[in-house]
């Protein structure tokens, strides 16, 4: 088996494991918030930093493709005036593998004050970001596909797959 094939199989296994580890309550909670967002013609605001930010942009584009008003909000810009785009009826999907990303944790209290629903898509369900959110989607992986276990590979594949699945249902 080639190294490329092995990497693809490991990422596929991580996605399959994620499908098994998501609880029905988590999924139903996220879908209910997204349905409410669509019914109210509100926005889905998606945010993340680094590789999670890149995945967040892709998820926003996918939701826009199916007709839900969705946008990516850079959390740094949010802290410097762009939070004005977020309304109480909106839903915010926050992506972070660690769940401890400082910029997202700084945005969290502002979202709470606005009454904006928060869904955390995190690699650590016991993280600060998870504790500050209304719904937590567990996107944890055992290890990255990268030989050094450093580059976000399996974790970004899982986060993107969960985002795609949310948009597809």
Kindly give the residue locations of the regions a language model identified.
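Glycine-rich phosphate-binding loops that contact phosphosugars or nucleotide phosphates
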Residues: 35, 43-169
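An N-terminal, well-structured beta->alpha segment
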Residues: 1-40
